[in-house]
Every structure is written in structure tokens, then in C-alpha cells.
Design a protein with these regions (language model features):
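Conserved "HGTGT" condensation-loop signature of ketosynthase/thiolase-family condensing enzymes
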Residues: 1-130, 160-241
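Active-site-proximal alpha-helical scaffold in enzymes
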Residues: 61-64, 132-155
Length: 241
């Protein structure tokens, strides 16, 4: 695989930070953060809608809306490793206990809840998709965006997010599982500032949040970073000015 594009805009919601300036300071070692620091209230989501969304979904929709206000988008791709596991757990718990299931939990338990709420709130009549590819969800979202750009779409919004993992699942998960909410959003356009190629990954390790690794390298103005997926290693080359 070999894909290329350029980044036109970035937004992030994580560690209690909401501006790219704060996150750039963190990426360069000039700001200390606590991974599970409380996140600020959404800037752009109505309160009644925000209450229905999982913690990471709120961040993802809010970050996407921020970029939609600054950019004329032609498509959107959301991705997530965790998906809506918070709502799923509540649905399963209700079934196991033979109790009524919350309509909100049921309707928000689908993987495209984030992108669906984004398109509704932004009133964006553009092609949208939600990518779930396990550990490789973010990188495959970039592939989806690249294909769209190659088919003459101009600007694609890519948002990757994670939610807090319910404690029940922590006992069955990898010890380095990222279990706090985070959302990273990019507007991509045609270009060659960033090139990604792949090679086999024979190790049983992977980056537990590919989008975060990618963003930190980008903000540090690194020339290259390697991101491990489940079966492939992604070599990312940055030639941004």
C-alpha cells in the first residue's frame, strides 16, 4: 500500500485540552497532561444531544463540528477501535438482568453513532462512512479518505476517537489498552506532504491509538514515524513545510 495526502486543518479533544496550540505544546514536551483529566464541555453540541452521547463520541462530534465550520468538506470518515462500547455494555447488561433497555443506549450503540450525529448537527449533505478495523481503524480511515480524494473529492474530514472502556471489559483486555476518551480530527486534501507505505508486522504488538501517535509526530514536525498495526507496520513520511 502506498498513499499520500496533505493535512489542511486539525482539531483535538483529549487530556482536558481543546486547542491545537495546547496539544502542540504537549507534543513538544512543554506541557504536562493527565490522560484521564476531565474534558471540557462540548463547544458546539446542544446540551440535550450531548447528554445522549458517550464521552468519546461527544469529543469526536465536537471536534468534527469545529473543522466543519472552518472548511468546505466534501466527505467525512469516522473511525474508532472502541466504538460505542459504553452503550453496548448497558444494552447487554439490561438483557442479562432481564430489565428494560434504555432507548438511548439502544439507538446510540451502533458504530456510526458519531458520524450520524455529526452529519445531523452540521447539516452536511455529504458522503459519510464509519470505519471499524480493530487496531487498524484509523489507518484504514486514511485509506478510505485517500480513495475519495483520488476520485476527485476535495476535502475529507477524518475523525478517530476512543471512549472510556467499561471496567467489566478491562479484565479481558490488553494491559496497555487506551481506556480514556480522546478524539483527533483532520481535514485531508490531495497532496504529497504525507506519504504512507506498509510492510509486514510480525510482532504481536500494535499502537493502541494510531491517531494519537500520528498526531504527535505531525505536531513535533518529525520526518518519519512507524505505526504498528495488527498485521502491518505503517511507515509515515512527513515532508510538511
Amino acid at each position: 500500500m502506498n498513499i499520500s495526502f496533505k493535512i489542511e486543518d486539525v482539531a483535538v479533544r483529549a487530556f482536558g485540552l481543546t486547542t491545537i496550540e495546547e496539544f502542540t505544546a504537549f507534543a513538544n514536551g512543554n506541557l504536562t497532561v493527565a490522560p484521564k483529566a476531565p474534558n471540557a464541555k462540548p463547544k458546539l453540541i446542544p446540551m440535550m444531544t450531548a447528554r445522549r452521547l458517550s464521552d468519546g463520541c461527544r469529543l469526536a462530534v465536537d471536534a468534527g463540528l469545529e473543522l466543519s465550520l472552518r472548511n468546505k468538506l466534501t466527505g467525512v470518515v469516522y473511525s474508532s477501535l472502541s466504538g460505542e462500547i459504553q452503550h453496548n455494555y448497558k444494552v447487554l447488561l439490561a438483557c442479562a438482568n432481564d430489565t428494560p433497555c434504555s432507548p438511548t443506549d439502544f439507538s446510540m450503540s451502533v458504530h456510526n453513532a458519531a458520524v450520524g450525529n455529526f452529519t445531523i448537527l452540521s447539516k452536511a449533505s455529504i458522503p459519510s462512512s464509519s470505519v471499524s478495523a480493530s487496531e487498524d481503524s484509523f489507518m484504514q480511515a486514511l485509506v478510505d479518505a485517500y480513495i475519495r480524494l483520488d476520485n476527485d473529492e476535495d476535502r475529507i474530514l477524518v475523525v478517530d476517537y476512543n471512549v472510556s472502556i467499561p471496567e467489566f471489559f478491562i479484565n479481558y483486555s490488553d494491559s496497555d489498552l487506551l481506556d480514556y476518551p480522546i478524539a483527533v480530527a483532520f481535514v485531508l486534501a490531495k497532496g504529497n506532504e504525507i506519504n504512507i507505505c506498509t510492510q509486514d508486522n510480525n510482532e504481536e504488538t500494535y499502537d493502541n491509538h494510531q491517531a494519537l501517535t500520528f498526531l504527535l509526530s505531525y505536531l513535533c514536525k518529525a520526518k518519519q514515524c512507524n505505526i504498528k498495526g495488527s498485521n502491518q507496520e505503517y511507515q509515515v513520511n512527513f515532508s510538511c513545510k
